[in-house]
Amino acid sequence: RDDVESRGLGDVYKRQALLYNTLDGKYIKTCNLKIIQILKEILCEKNCGVVLLPQHIYDDIEIKTFINELQSKFMGDIIEVSLSEGKPVQILPYLNYKDLHKNKHQFSSLENLLQTLCEITIYLDNTVNIKTLIEYLRSFSLNLTYNIIGDWKDIPHGSLLIDYLGQMSYSNYIQCSYTHIPLLESSLKKNFSYQVYVSLPVDHSLMNNTCIFLDQQKIPFQYIFQVTSLEDCNEAVTLIEKYDIDKYQLRPLYTKDNISFLAKNTFLTEEDILSTKISMKDIFRKHIINKDNFGKLFILSNGDIYANILHKKLGNIKTDSIYQIVKKEIEIGESWLRIRNQKPCCDCLYQYICPSPSDLDLMIGQLNLCTVNNK
């Protein structure tokens, strides 16, 4: 008789099981009920990652083949019972905050709740009160990532905000259209970068001027091409090659009538999901938080604050402290803790291997932007 142990992360859903090695991304997927039963026993906390394997079960060719694969992928092993004085113990990774989404006060009791905050996006137009905004930012004085949307040069005291952020943070981004790029003072360039959004088709004269302008600024920049069709993708590739653009993204947009384009080009397949190596920390992180949204806030020009523009507002800079805003989002918000705990994702083998739910999911109104459970 032998003891069998597993060193991979394992999940069992109904009649399927997945073992995943977070060190190299290798995996074993099985629908064999005999193997699934063994895995269930291994994953049971009281068994401490090790179960007894009687000889008659080990002699089963399917079980033996599985164990050989387990060993070859360094995801588990078998140990002769006679070589051990007692049952071996293996510490399996378990999530400490299993009921976090039921007991969100566990998050709110953090010694410094504001440590969860990492990024603020600020929208500017001629209605914004810059002095009130700066006063609000000073109330917590954290070294965060700041994104600025809008041209501060047309706003009274707008330059005060840019000066303040230049002193407060080394990670500031000017998000703007390629048709209008605000000019930064030379003294601030080291603490700012441009994120230039390109809607297609482009005005080629403006695009040419923008590329020349950015090359002259000696400041980091990235182009974000907003694509809604295959034609947009082709044009983006043409522009990238023409202007020798190194840093760029192709970001899909939903227009209500391009779902077939998105389904064909952005929906994940099973192969896509398993092609990227994911760390154990990332997998457990996605049990608790939305990796794309957690820690991010948006401040509109009227002072309203959101965790996600597609969700309800959390408050306003004139009436709510940043602590109240963060606490509210954690306790009753819809964005930071939005995970794949709803159907069909909660019944899927890849629930926490998949990326966190995205804004595209919200806009389309479909949680599973994949082909795994849509067959």
Language-model features, listed with the residues they occupy:
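Single conserved hydrophobic/aromatic residue that forms the stacking wall/gate
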Residues: 2-13
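Long, charge-rich, low-complexity alpha-helical segments
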Residues: 29-125, 129-145, 159-164, 347
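A broadly conserved sequence feature marking short terminus-proximal activation segments
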Residues: 79, 284-333
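Core AdoMet radical
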Residues: 113-128, 137-157, 165-184, 191-205, ...
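Non-catalytic interaction/Regulatory regions outside core domains
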Residues: 206-259, 366-375
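A C-terminal junction/extension of Radical SAM enzymes
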Residues: 234-308, 351-353
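C-terminal accessory region of radical SAM enzymes
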Residues: 260-278, 310-355
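Iron-sulfur (Fe-S) cluster-binding segments and ferredoxin-like electron-carrier domains
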Residues: 312, 351-375
